[in-house]
Amino acid sequence: QGVRSFGMALSPRELGVGEYGGGLLEFPEDALPPGTPLAEAWPEEVVLDLEVTPNRPDALGLLGLARDLHALGYALVEPEAALKAEALPLPFALKVEDPEGAPHFTLGYAFGLRVAPSPLWMQRALFAAGMRPINNVVDVTNYVMLERAQPMHAFDLRFIGEGILVRRARPGERLRTLDGVERTLHPEDLVIAGWRGEESFP
């Protein structure tokens, strides 16, 4: 088009800062002034690749690893929750059909959220852990999951119907995951689904 190019948009994999290569690396709005060197925006850091041998779910997150190190004499600083939650009635129902598979299920809800890119420091942390940042709502659940080894997911209240149902997968049930892949579920898989009337949908 007769316009000289002084740069190129690249994926995290092409830049060597993450494993995701299916799209461009995007920065939050107003996070960096134009022309900022990548070395300043994304400083080099050490990433540890650890194998956790005990079959202890609470030991598989960052906090669990820190507690193990604390047992060896290292200092431990427990993260504090910045948000104080109130115990309020949920605006939807919860059904757990399989209490053996899901003996404890916690729900919370928030209103007035604005979906936007995550802060750069959180994107960097997720990339370092081999995860692809998506947006601030999804990313914070993944970040806390990595920190506390507690599976989490964010749901859009507009699309869950009458409530949330925790059940086993039906024979031959298929589910399209966030990466766009359609997967066939096993009858032993736990499914978190919304429902309307007699119909439930993952």
Placement of each model-derived feature along the sequence:
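Conserved alpha/beta core surface patches that mediate binding of polyanionic ligands
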Residues: 26-33, 79-89, 193-202
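Short beta-alpha junctions and helix-cap segments that line functional grooves
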Residues: 177-180, 187-188, 202
